[in-house]
Amino acid sequence: MICITTPASTFDEFAKRLEPLVNEGQTLFVVPGSGGAEFAFYNLIQKGMILLGMQRVHSISRLKTYGQSVYMLGRKEELHIGTIPADAVDRYKEIVENLFSIKTDTLPNYLNVTLT
């Protein structure tokens, strides 16, 4: 699984660099999954990658001391994920729940991820 947490403005360049390195069946996990990820990573999806996106970030943090520490303001009580193709979403529910230790719900399609 390849996890991307960069701003949406970096997606196009990231997709270009990633394209020669990926294989069918690999997973690209975008957090958050909005920002046009489905368009930026279209060629990777066409190569058979699974796009997994989370509606929102799992927690919020703020800078405490520059270059030294941050603090967490809070965590979501529940996460929502979607995939392209849509029928792949169920296999990621447990993975995301274990990764973040937060209850995770699956969405019927990726459009639900983008319209948040």
Q: What are the roles of these predicted feature ranges?
A:
Residues 2-3:
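N-terminal Rossmann-like NAD(P) cofactor-binding module of classical short-chain dehydrogenase/reductase
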Residues 8-65:
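Rossmann-like NAD(P)(H) cofactor-binding subdomain of soluble oxidoreductases
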Residues 7, 33, 82-86:
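Structural motif
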Residues 65-116:
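Internal alpha-helical scaffold of NAD(P)-dependent oxidoreductase catalytic cores
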